[in-house]
Amino acid sequence: MGRFLLVTLSMLVVTFSLNEANSCCCPQDWLPKNGFCYKVFNDLKNWNDAEMFCRKFKPGCHLASIHSNADSADLAEYISDYLKSDGHVWIGLNDPRKQRTWVWSDRSSTNYLAWNQGEPNNSKNIEYCVHLWALTGYLKWNDTPCEALYHFICQCKF
């Protein structure tokens, strides 16, 4: 019985230590996930201004990149909890060469895509930036003009 209790307590200590390691370096109100910290901002900015805002935190910060269904679900829940008003949210995916080749602003792999049905459609030939669509609970993406004013989510390593 004593050994079982010792092993159980040891496992709890390790579990709490790992949880703390995941969140120890993120500022308050930032979401720790996969070695990054994420923060949604209620300000309205165009895509370029939002990306520059994120970069000013520290080198290596960008609009968020999303690489799995699990990441998408966690970010959607976080945004729903912390965004003070309804509206779309910029992410780091864009088409800087205007050739329908989507890249993340942090240059990470585009190994995961979550377009809403019928997207990307490049309506009026002017949609080169991507936002999380509020109407889908922030789970699906839409291409839109980069000049649109939306909330945004930054991704940083602290």
Swiss-Prot record:
PROSITE patterns in alphabetical order: C_TYPE_LECTIN_1, C_TYPE_LECTIN_2
Domain of life of the organism encoding this protein: Eukaryota
Disulfide bonds: C26-C37, C54-C154, C129-C146
Signal peptide coordinates: 1-20
GO MF annotations, alphabetized: carbohydrate binding; metal ion binding
Keyword Secreted attributed: yes
Function according to Swiss-Prot or TrEMBL: Mannose-binding lectin that binds to and agglutinates erythrocytes in a calcium-dependent manner.
PANTHER family (alphabetical): MANNOSE, PHOSPHOLIPASE, LECTIN RECEPTOR RELATED
Protein name, UniProt field: C-type lectin mannose-binding isoform
Cellular localization per UniProt: Secreted
Family: Belongs to the true venom lectin family.
Glycosylation: residue positions: N121
CDD domains recorded: CLECT_REG-1_like
GO cellular component terms, semicolon-separated: extracellular region
SMART domains per record: CLECT (SM00034)
Disulfide bond listed as a keyword: yes
Residues bound to Ca(2+): E127, N142, D143
Listed Gene3D superfamilies: Mannose-Binding Protein A, subunit A
C-type lectin domain sequence ranges: 33-155
Tissue: Expressed by the venom gland.
Keyword list, A-Z: Calcium, Disulfide bond, Glycoprotein, Hemagglutinin, Lectin, Metal-binding, Secreted, Signal
